[in-house]
Curated annotation (Swiss-Prot):
It comes from Pseudarthrobacter chlorophenolicus (strain ATCC 700700 / DSM 12829 / CIP 107037 / JCM 12360 / KCTC 9906 / NCIMB 13794 / A6). It comes from the Bacteria. CDD domains: NTP-PPase_HisE. One of its GO terms (molecular function) is ATP binding. It is found in: Cytoplasm. The gene is hisE. This is Phosphoribosyl-ATP pyrophosphatase.
């Protein structure tokens, strides 16, 4: 099972190696603006799932939001430690 750290390591590897057809690479190539739009979209989907859908659906939407937030972190050059110090 993935956790926040293993997901970040996996995404960092994809950002470094840029495998062809990678969704992560495509999202990074869309830049901070494009990634930010995706974060906003996913945040709305989290809210809607939490409000109107099952716990399973809400958990899935939250996982997708976490993915896009980590891609945004990579695009900005942020590390997990950069974020953790604000928790």
């Amino acid at each position: 099972m993935k956790n926040f750290e293993t997901l970040f390591a996996e995404l960092s590897e994809k950002a470094a190696t840029r495998p062809e057809g990678s969704r992560t690479v495509a999202e990074l190539d869309s830049g901070v603006h494009g990634i930010g739009k995706k974060v906003v979209e996913e945040a709305a989907e989290v809210w809607m799932a939490a409000e109107y859908e099952s716990d399973e659906a809400a958990a899935e939407e939250i996982s997708q939001l976490l993915y896009h937030l980590q891609v945004l972190m990579l695009a900005k050059g942020l590390t997990l430690e950069d974020v953790y110090k604000h928790l």
